[in-house]
């Protein structure tokens, strides 16, 4: 290998043997790529980086063969195909996943050993693709893995963000955001498709043609260029695509005259605006420009994807003669992952009417039979509402279409259900508020989709009973539940190989990796002392690995013999990281007041918290700062730091999760009941034998049912109690627990430094008012939370009981595979079938 360690080279000259499974041939192929697919000059050769690039290129050879076979097979069979549109994907590292799914992990490990390298070290060179932020993006990626594993004809569509959301640094000031330059070196996993380019128009105006038809003209036109990422299934030949769009301007939009005149910015204005579209995920939208940019991103994804879908439909149908538009919904299913891709609805209508010449009724029939919508939230601020003025400016033709959909919807309801007249203001798509008229994107989705689903049973029940109750009375069969799931490949098989090996040994099969329900058979061994010893040993190996990682990234030394207590998720007041840290503060204060002998009787604990706070979300950033300040004080206090450590884990992403989750023993899912649609990290922790402390919210409800109430540390108000508790608070009826007051007072005493935490603490105080009145019920749930934590401490001391609970947690996780979720989508929403590559 060029510039590498010569002594370990396999001696033969490198040859490309892309499909061989012999380690010597693979080593030769890796060497071949190092020489002939160079990503570095020979003078700047970094062995690990270069071995990663060459190994990835070598694995990609196999993927491309399977990818082409899959595409040709789908083309020949012409099945109905699903297209999954999402603003976010959180793929994680592709190399680990590819060698695992292709079942070539050991062969590649041996090949790299022959070259003097370790696969584990080579894998570490890959940066996570920064294409998402939280659960929404990770769910989309789990779904893609399951679609391929189940041999379903399905593609994902997204945007190729240059800098992602942001990279999180933790400094003395708290969270600092810098660009996440994941493409800084290169990504060997994406293939640019220079032949797949579509025009995307913004602004302009609508022209009425002599025929009476309408045409959107003028404005500015950018190009959408496709980058494809292969999505291999587990032990199957099917390899699907994630197609990511990048924005660019055409060469005609570069003004050479102005450039040569020294007017460089003016010469390339459109090029500059094109670069903005895929620069970052969720650009700040406090300004008019920010709102326009977000809307541009959403439309860019919708329009490019639809043009591509229509082109493929025509190509496949025309191969049989000519295409019939009535066939479109029989060949295409489009799933909108939340409201971000809602503009798919008016854009499909526009393409069918204005470009293909169909009438309104036929276009509407096709659109409403093709599109389905997944709702992910009941949080009012997350239900998108766009200013009508901004929409008219950017997308004038689409606003005409939305107006017509709204008008026809209102007319239908008034004629068929006059009893709903007083509900129309909240049901209609266009809100004609005199001061700030908006478009309700969720309403547009519900009116225009054939199916609407929630993502956990409780969430779907709340949607039907509250958020969309009036629509349910009109379309009772339109609403479904599809409880979320996770891929067992990434979330246990690959990230916790020791535990996976034990499960396979005791079940006498590895079929559980694709049939997770088989885990239930572990229950019969839940008291077996031999399994207990193996289980505890695997958990300890994962904890030691995690302790090394924490020392490496934070400099904090943690004890693997302490209870590892982890809360990792987006920082948000409803997810209540504040409840967690207030509990930690109270624990610290009590430990501080104990004698050394008393401390020895406590359960030592390491509390880890991680997640990103949106750059403009001030209170969330204050919570990050508080966690880091508490950690600084607690970890350097010699009286207590053998019994309590507090760590903020920076820049939480998929790869960090793959380290944290296998090493966790207690995981906190403590949102205010009724506010978390589902949650999926709870499923990942439970699958890895981690016990949950949580509220009856989202998928917690179903996890508790599956693993058994005795194996779940429950606390807090229930979803149906929350509205009354908020009313009681407004009426001054809330009496705070003394422990809660003590924890807040301890912060105010300056115990954790001079930072002004009053604005954060005041959000928990008073009875009402903006940013006050403890909307998320931290104070109400604090006493039952502390009592549940005391139960955790007691349970952890009884090792036999704890390990049994851990085994039962894993064995009860069979329902939460994304394979089950996707099978249900395929049968009950998309109406698509397996299309296995022979």
Curated annotation (Swiss-Prot):
One of its GO terms (biological process) is glycogen catabolic process. It is found in: Cytoplasm. Residues 1-21 are annotated as: Disordered. The modification N6-(pyridoxal phosphate)lysine is found at residue 684. Its main location: cytoplasm. Pfam families: Phosphorylase. The keyword Cell division does not apply. Gene3D superfamilies: Glycogen Phosphorylase B. SUPFAM superfamilies: UDP-Glycosyltransferase/glycogen phosphorylase (SSF53756). It catalyses: [(1->4)-alpha-D-glucosyl](n) + phosphate = [(1->4)-alpha-D-glucosyl](n-1) + alpha-D-glucose 1-phosphate. It comes from the Eukaryota. One of its GO terms (molecular function) is glycogen phosphorylase activity. GO terms for cellular component: cytoplasm. Phosphorylase is an important allosteric enzyme in carbohydrate metabolism. Enzymes from different sources differ in their regulatory mechanisms and in their natural substrates. However, all known phosphorylases share catalytic and structural properties. Belongs to the glycogen phosphorylase family. This is Alpha-glucan phosphorylase, H isozyme. It comes from Solanum tuberosum (Potato).
């Amino acid at each position: 290998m060029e510039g590498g360690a010569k002594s370990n080279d396999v001696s033969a000259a490198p040859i490309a043997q892309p499909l061989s499974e012999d380690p010597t041939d693979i080593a030769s192929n890796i060497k071949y790529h190092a020489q002939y697919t160079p990503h570095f000059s020979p003078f700047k050769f970094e062995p690990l980086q270069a071995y990663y690039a060459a190994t990835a290129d070598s694995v990609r050879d196999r993927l491309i063969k399977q990818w082409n076979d899959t595409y040709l097979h789908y083309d020949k069979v012409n099945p109905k195909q699903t297209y999954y549109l999402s603003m976010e994907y959180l793929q994680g590292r592709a190399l680990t996943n590819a060698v695992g799914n292709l079942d070539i992990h050991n062969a590649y490990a041996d090949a790299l050993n022959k070259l003097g390298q370790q696969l584990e070290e080579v894998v570490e060179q890959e940066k996570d693709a920064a294409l998402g932020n939280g659960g929404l993006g990770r769910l989309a990626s789990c779904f893609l893995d399951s679609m391929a594993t189940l041999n379903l004809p399905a593609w994902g569509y997204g945007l190729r963000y240059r800098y992602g959301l942001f990279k999180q640094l933790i400094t003395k000031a708290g969270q600092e955001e810098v660009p996440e330059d994941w493409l800084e070196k290169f990504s060997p996993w994406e293939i640019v498709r220079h032949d797949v380019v579509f025009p995307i128009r913004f602004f302009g105006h609508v022209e009425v043609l002599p025929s009476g038809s309408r045409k959107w003209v003028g404005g500015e036109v950018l190009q959408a260029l496709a980058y494809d990422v292969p999505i291999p299934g587990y032990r199957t030949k099917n390899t699907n695509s994630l197609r990511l769009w990048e924005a660019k301007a055409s060469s005609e939009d570069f003004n050479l005259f102005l450039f040569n005149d020294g007017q460089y910015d003016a010469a390339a204005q459109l090029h500059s605006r094109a670069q903005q579209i895929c620069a970052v995920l969720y650009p700040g939208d406090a300004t008019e420009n920010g709102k326009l940019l977000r809307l541009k991103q959403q439309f860019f994804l919708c329009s490019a994807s639809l043009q591509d879908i229509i082109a493929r439909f025509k190509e496949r149908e025309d191969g049989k003669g000519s295409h019939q538009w009535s066939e479109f919904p029989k060949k295409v299913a489009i799933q909108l992952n939340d409201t971000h891709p809602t503009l798919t609805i008016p854009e499909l209508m526009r393409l069918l009417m204005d470009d293909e010449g169909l009438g309104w009724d036929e276009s509407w029939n096709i659109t409403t039979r093709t599109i389905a919508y997944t709702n992910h939230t009941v949080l009012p601020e997350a239900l998108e509402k766009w200013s009508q003025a901004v929409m008219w400016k950017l997308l004038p033709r689409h606003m005409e279409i939305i107006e017509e959909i709204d008008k026809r919807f209102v007319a239908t309801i008034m004629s068929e259900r006059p009893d709903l007249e007083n509900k129309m203001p909240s049901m209609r798509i266009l809100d004609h508020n005199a001061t700030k008229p908006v478009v309700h994107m969720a309403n547009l989705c519900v009116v225009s989709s054939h199916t609407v689903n929630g993502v956990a049973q409780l969430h779907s029940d709340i949607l039907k009973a509250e958020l969309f109750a009036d629509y349910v009375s009109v379309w009772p069969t339109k609403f479904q539940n599809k409880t979320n799931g996770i891929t067992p490949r990434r979330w246990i098989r690959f990230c916790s190989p020791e535990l996976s090996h034990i499960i396979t040994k005791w079940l006498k099969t590895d079929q559980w990796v694709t049939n997770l329900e088989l885990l239930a058979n572990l229950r019969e061994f839940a008291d077996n002392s031999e399994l207990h010893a193996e289980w505890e040993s695997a958990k300890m190996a994962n904890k030691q690995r995690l302790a090394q990682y924490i020392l490496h990234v934070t400099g904090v030394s943690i004890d693997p013999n302490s209870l590892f207590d982890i809360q990792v998720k987006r920082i948000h007041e409803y997810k209540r990281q504040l409840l967690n840290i207030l509990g930690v503060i109270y624990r610290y204060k009590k430990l501080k007041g104990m004698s050394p002998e008393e401390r020895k009787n406590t359960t030592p604990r390491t509390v880890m918290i991680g997640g990103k706070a949106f750059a403009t979300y001030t209170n969330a950033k204050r919570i990050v700062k508080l966690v880091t300040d508490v950690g600084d004080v607690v970890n350097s206090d010699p009286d207590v730091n053998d019994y309590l450590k507090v760590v903020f884990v920076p820049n939480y992403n998929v790869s960090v999760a793959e380290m944290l989750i296998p090493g966790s023993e207690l995981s906190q899912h403590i949102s205010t009941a009724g506010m978390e649609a589902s949650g999926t990290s709870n499923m990942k922790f439970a699958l890895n034998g981690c016990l949950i402390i949580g509220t009856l919210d989202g998928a917690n409800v179903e996890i508790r049912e599956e693993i058994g109430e005795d194996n779940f540390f429950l606390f807090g108000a229930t979803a149906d109690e929350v509205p009354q508790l908020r009313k009681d608070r407004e009426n001054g009826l809330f009496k705070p627990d003394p422990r809660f007051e003590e924890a807040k007072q301890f912060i105010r005493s300056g115990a954790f430094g001079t930072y002004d935490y009053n604005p954060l603490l005041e959000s928990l105080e008073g009875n009402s008012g903006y940013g006050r009145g403890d909307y998320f019920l931290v104070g109400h749930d604090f006493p039952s939370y502390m009592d549940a934590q005391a139960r955790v401490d007691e349970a952890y001391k009884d090792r036999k009981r704890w390990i049994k609970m851990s085994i039962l947690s894993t064995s009860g996780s069979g329902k939460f595979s994304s394979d089950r979720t996707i099978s249900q989508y395929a049968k009950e929403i998309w109406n698509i079938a397996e299309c296995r590559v022979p």
